[in-house]
Design a protein with these regions (language model features):
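Surface-exposed, secretory/extracytoplasmic low-complexity segments enriched in Ser/Thr/Asn/Gly/Pro
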Residues: 1-248, 252
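Stable alpha-helical elements in mature extracytoplasmic
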Residues: 54, 133-145, 179, 212-216, ...
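Surface-exposed patches in mature extracellular/periplasmic domains of secreted proteins
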Residues: 72, 151-157, 192-198, 228-232, ...
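Flexible glycine/proline-enriched surface loops and loop-helix/loop-strand junctions
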Residues: 121-123, 251-257, 286-288, 298-306, ...
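Structured C-terminal helix/loop/strand segments within mature extracytoplasmic catalytic/sensor domains
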Residues: 223, 259, 364-367, 374-496
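Active-site-proximal beta-strand/loop segments in catalytic clefts of secreted hydrolases
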Residues: 234-236, 245-247, 274, 294-297, ...
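Active-site SXXK
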Residues: 258-282, 293, 461
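Mid-domain, small-residue-enriched loop/turn segments at the edges of structured enzyme/sensor domains
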Residues: 306-394
Length: 496
């Protein structure tokens, strides 16, 4: 009887344990079933945990993060970019399908068994699937940001009453092409939702040539010069030019041009003709006379060169013919320099036939600021690019080497006055100056014609002045110096 009781107790105990196991398993199965309909605990989407969340809850969590505005910084400004403004949207169907596929990779009972034994599982991350409109983003950057926050650079401008220019200020400009991929990265990021926009600095624009002309006119007006003055400036890089004549401050219409006494600037045409006739193998005596003619302005050297290297009797006429071949029809030399030299020809030009403005031009030598400036431009082009009018007019007679020699001779004219006085020391100025005094020592005509080689660009500047009563040298020199300085400053405005 005792053994039967013990066996019965064991059976009942086993039955109870089995029943408890069934109950516990059933409870765990019910609990797991509830968990099974949600995403597995090891699942994340784009690094965002969505384990144990329903499909709707997972999408809401993603939307909460990816619908947050993106902060864009443009200098000190903060712009809030709503992702929907650029068409940003999650591809929820693809995301949920990928997550569901991951959930069902393991069978229900296998997953339940792992759950019962609390077996660790490897984390799984579903990549983000989203899109945006490149066109809408580009339009947003252009209309909402660039148009509002870009700052244009302010150009350098002449300072009234001075020879200087006010330095311009740089501007800022949104770099749209660089911004697009950077913003795309931020839109798709769960934790980096701000961006400093790339900005390009824009340099101030250079003042226009018209600004320079206005400044030159103001300088002349402030100087009080009440004679006739002609100005010519040629930009040797861009080909722009300034050309005007003022008579007692009043603009003189051209064409026809206004002629001036050429004085010693006529020695530039003489030099061109000499090189045309002597070729590259120049003798020592010719070199000395060229130096004396240009650097020392010795008139007898000019006569020697014309008589010995061009034509003994008609050298001035041949110089004039060379200028006419170049199209410089208002520039001529009608006689030698020595006292009592005869007038070889009376030249009638469109410029010296004007009656509305008079400069009492010398019948022996005349030119205009425009024509002597064009001749200097021809020499420059010949020396630098082996081209220009000199090559076209005198093929095989004038070479690049000869033109470079012409410029070197003109650089030797160092006087530290007029155009040269307006540029910094050490600046190469290839020029010829001149003035004429009457029998009483009074100056009526003053001129300077130059090629200026500056760091910011090379240019031609010619100035001719006439006054029927007197040109007082110091004020006239100051005027030319200021004009020269203003032009040099125009080409060499400091970088902000």
């Amino acid at each position: 009887m005792r053994n039967r009781g013990s066996l019965s107790f064991f059976r009942w105990g086993s039955l109870v344990l089995i029943l408890l196991a069934v109950v516990v398993t059933t409870l765990q199965l019910v609990r797991f079933s509830r968990l099974w309909i949600n995403f597995p605990s090891n699942l994340s989407i784009a690094g965002i945990p969505v384990g144990q969340l329903t499909r709707q809850q997972a999408i809401e969590r993603l939307l909460t993060i990816y619908s947050q505005p993106v902060e864009l910084y443009y200098n000190e400004a903060i712009i809030q970019l709503d992702p929907t403004a650029v068409g940003f949207a999650l591809d929820t169907d693809v995301i949920l399908a990928a997550a569901e596929q991951e959930r069902t990779l393991t069978s229900f009972w296998e997953a339940f068994w792992n759950y019962l034994w609390d077996r660790p599982v490897q984390p799984v991350d579903i990549p983000l699937r989203a899109s945006y409109s490149d066109d809408r983003l580009r339009a947003y950057l252009q209309t909402e940001i660039a148009s509002r926050y870009d700052q244009p650079a302010t150009p350098a401008l002449p300072i009234v009453g001075t020879t200087n220019f006010k330095v311009g200020t740089p501007g800022s400009e949104l770099d749209i092409e660089r911004s697009i991929p950077l913003i795309e990265t931020v839109l798709f990021s769960r934790n980096q939702r701000s961006l400093v926009l790339p900005i390009k600095k824009t340099s101030p624009s250079h003042p226009s040539f018209q600004n320079l002309e206005v400044l030159l006119r103001q300088i002349i007006d402030l100087s009080g010069f009440d004679g006739v003055i002609g100005i010519y400036v040629e930009d040797l890089q861009a080909g722009q030019d300034i050309n005007f004549i003022l008579d007692q401050g009043t603009h003189v219409a051209t064409p026809p041009d206004v002629v001036f006494s050429a004085s010693s600037t006529i020695k530039i045409p003489i030099m061109v003709s000499v090189f045309r006739h002597i070729g590259e193998n120049i003798d020592a005596e010719s070199v000395k006379n060229l130096e004396d003619m240009i650097a020392k302005s010795i008139n007898s050297a000019s006569d020697w060169l014309m008589q010995n290297k061009i034509d003994r009797d008609n050298g001035p006429i041949l110089v004039t013919e060379d200028m006419q071949t170049l199209g410089l029809n208002n520039t001529f030399l009608a006689g030698h320099f020595y006292p009592g030299a005869p007038l070889l020809h009376v030249y009638s030009t469109s410029a010296n036939q004007r009656t509305d403005v008079s400069t009492d031009p010398d019948p022996y030598s005349q030119t205009t600021p425009l024509e002597i400036g064009q001749l200097l431009q021809d020499i420059y082009q010949c020396a630098n690019i082996s081209g220009g009018s000199l090559f076209a007019a005198f093929p095989a007679e004038i070479t690049q080497t000869e033109c470079q020699s012409m410029i070197n001779y003109l650089i030797q004219d160092r006087i530290a006055l007029l155009i040269q006085a307006g540029v910094p020391d050490g600046t190469n100025v290839a020029h010829k100056h001149g003035w004429v005094t009457d029998m009483y020592g009074i100056i009526h005509d003053l001129s300077d014609a130059a090629i200026v080689f500056s760091p910011g660009g090379d240019y031609v500047f010619t100035v001719y002045m006439y006054h029927p009563v007197q040109i007082v040298f110091d004020p006239a020199n100051e005027l030319v110096k200021n004009l020269s300085r203003a032009i040099y400053n125009y080409y060499n405005i400091p970088t902000p």
